[in-house]
Each structure stands twice: as structure tokens, then as C-alpha cells.
């Protein structure tokens, strides 16, 4: 194995999750203590460039020890690569961003963020392979939420 390069992720402390988009041109990063999501381009040789965008989340939740600020815990592009989703444990919100793959930019989508019950603590999620359902695991209240993303709105 060989390290091709490295870049500063730009989103603050404790990057905790990364995932590559369907085209292989971008990697998305969640920064737990930075309260941010970053979009990083992937070059033709597989190395990475400087972030094209860093989106900062604001807010907090009712748990003073775990939700004192935004804590994006996971970030994933949707199955069609049109949207990027973010579970924010600190704010009890599930974000959806429209993704511009040509420019490597995110824009908050209509109907987002989805606010979950106070103290839920959304952490990880996955997409159903045949429907528009998203299964969202909430760490702090030990629940599983099913989100219907049908029709372009949450």
C-alpha cells in the first residue's frame, strides 16, 4: 500500500465518516466535533484535492453531554447520486442536500432538514434497494426510524 497524498479536510475536528459518490469523483466527509460536512474531489489518479465545499451545521439537542452542538455522524450520497444525506446526532436532524456533481457543491433540499424526536441522536442510515425508504438508526433513544424520501421531499 502507498499513500498518494493527503489534504486537510477543512471541516474542523474529528472527521468520523467518509463515502465516495457513485461516479467516483467525490468523497464526502462528516466531521463529528467540527459540525460540518465536506466535499472533496477525487483526481483521475485517485489522489484527492482541496475541499470544494464545507457546509457547517448549527444547533444542539436536549442531551447536554452528547448534544451540546452539531455532530454530523454519517454522510452518504443517495442511490441515484442526486442527493447527499447527513445524520446529525447533535441536532436530532436528518439533512438532505441536492448534489451538483459538476461543481462538487451541496445545497439544502426542499423539506430538509427532517427534525427527529428530541434526544433521538441519529447516527447511521441505509437505503432500501427497491423503494424510496431510508432506515435511520438513532443512537441516543435506541430507535430505528423509517424515512420516506419519495417524490423529492422528506
How does the language model describe each region?
Residues 4-54:
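A generic, well-ordered mixed alpha/beta core segment in the N-terminal half of proteins
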Residues 10-22, 26, 58-82, 116-134:
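Beta-rich, blade/repeat-based domains predominating
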Residues 32-34, 42, 89-90, 99, ...:
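Short loop/turn segments immediately following the C-termini of beta-strands
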Residues 2-8, 49-59, 106-114:
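Beta-propeller fold detector
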Residues 1, 39-49, 97-106, 147-154:
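Short loop/turn segments immediately following beta-strands, especially the blade-tip
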Residues 1, 35-38, 92-94, 142-144:
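Structural signal for beta-propeller blades
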Residues 29-32, 78, 86-89, 128, ...:
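Conserved beta-strand positions in repeat-built beta-propeller and related beta-rich domains
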Residues 109-154:
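Acidic, glycine-rich loop-and-beta core segments that form the ion-binding/anion-interacting portion
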Amino acid at each position: 500500500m502507498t499513500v498518494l497524498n493527503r489534504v486537510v479536510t477543512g471541516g474542523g475536528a474529528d472527521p468520523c465518516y467518509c463515502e465516495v459518490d457513485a461516479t467516483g469523483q467525490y468523497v464526502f466527509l462528516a466531521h463529528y466535533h467540527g459540525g460540518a460536512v465536506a466535499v472533496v474531489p477525487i483526481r483521475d489518479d485517485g489522489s484527492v484535492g482541496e475541499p470544494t465545499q464545507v457546509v457547517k451545521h448549527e444547533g444542539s439537542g436536549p442531551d447536554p453531554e452528547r448534544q451540546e452542538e452539531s455532530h454530523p455522524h454519517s454522510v452518504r450520497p443517495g442511490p441515484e447520486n442526486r442527493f447527499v444525506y447527513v445524520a446529525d446526532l447533535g441536532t436530532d436532524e436528518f439533512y438532505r442536500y441536492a448534489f451538483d456533481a459538476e461543481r462538487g457543491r451541496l445545497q439544502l433540499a426542499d423539506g430538509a432538514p427532517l427534525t427527529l424526536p428530541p434526544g433521538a441522536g441519529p447516527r447511521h442510515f441505509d437505503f432500501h434497494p427497491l423503494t424510496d425508504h431510508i432506515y435511520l438508526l438513532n443512537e441516543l433513544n435506541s430507535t430505528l426510524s423509517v424515512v420516506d424520501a419519495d417524490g423529492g421531499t422528506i
